[in-house]
Amino acid sequence: MRDREQARARRVVLWIYLVATVVAVLITWPLAAWHPIARTLAATLVATLVVFAGSRLFDNSSIYDPYWSVLPIALALWHEHDAPDDASGGRQALVLILVLLWGVRLTYNCLRGWTGLGHEDWRYREFRTSWGRWYWPGSLLGIHMFPTLLTWLGCF
C-alpha cells in the first residue's frame, strides 16, 4: 500500500510540475520583447505560483521541495535554447550536462525520501503551528517564492 501511495504522490507532483512548465512557457510568448533574463524570471514566478496552488490544494508545502533541483534544469534548457548564435556550443553543452546530472541526482534523492502526500517536511509542520492562520501567506512568500528567487539568482 505504501508503494501505491508513493507512486500516486509522485504522479500528482509530476502533473503539478508539468502544468507549471506549460504555464511558464506560455507566459513567455507575450513577453517576447523582454530581455531573456526578465522573461525567465516572469516564467519562474508564474511556475512557482502554480506549484504553490498545488501545495495549497493538497495541503502540503513539501510539493515545492523538488523545485530546488528542477528549476535549474529548466533554466539551463531555456538558456541553451535561447542562447545567441555565436555562443560557445561546447561550453553550453558542458554546463547543460552538469546541471542535468546534478538536478536529476538531487531530484531523485528528494523523491526517494518522500513517502507521499501525507509527509511534509518537519520544518513546515512547525511553521504551521507557530504561524497559525498566516501559514499559507508565509508559505507562499517564505517557502515558495524566496527559495525560487534564490535559485533563479543562483542560475546566473
Task: Locate the predicted segments by residue.
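Membrane-anchoring alpha-helices and their flanking helix-loop junctions
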Residues: 1-156
